[in-house]
Design a protein with these regions (language model features):
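Amphipathic alpha-helical coiled-coil segments
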Residues: 50-69
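Long amphipathic alpha-helical coiled-coil segments
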Residues: 64-82
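Amphipathic, hydrophobic secondary-structure cores in small proteins
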Residues: 35, 39-44
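N-terminal acidic leader/helix
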Residues: 2-35, 61, 78-81
Length: 84
C-alpha cells in the first residue's frame, strides 16, 4: 500500500469513528428528551462513545490492520446511518 493510500484509509477510518460517536450522541440526546429516559441505555451508549473516541485517539496511520478492522466493522454501519 502506498503512502497516499495509507493516509486515505486512515482518514476514512477516523471519519467513520467520528460518525459513530455522533450517532451515539444523537441517540443519547433523543433518549434524554423522553419523559422517563432509560439511564442504563444512555450509559451503554456513553461507554461506546468513549471506546470509539479512544480508538480514534490511539489510531496511527501505520496501524494498517487496525484501520482495516475499523473500516470493515464500521463501514456498513456508517453507510446506513448516513442514508438515514
Amino acid at each position: 500500500m502506498n503512502n497516499a493510500n495509507k493516509w486515505e484509509q486512515y482518514d476514512v477510518a477516523r471519519n467513520r469513528l467520528r460518525i459513530m460517536v455522533g450517532h451515539y450522541s444523537e441517540l443519547i440526546r433523543n433518549e434524554e428528551s423522553k419523559a422517563v429516559p432509560d439511564i442504563e441505555q444512555i450509559e451503554k451508549w456513553e461507554d461506546e462513545q468513549h471506546e470509539l473516541s479512544e480508538k480514534e485517539s490511539l489510531l496511527s496511520v501505520d496501524d494498517t490492520s487496525g484501520i482495516a478492522e475499523i473500516n470493515e466493522t464500521y463501514g456498513p454501519l456508517t453507510q446506513a446511518i448516513m442514508k438515514g
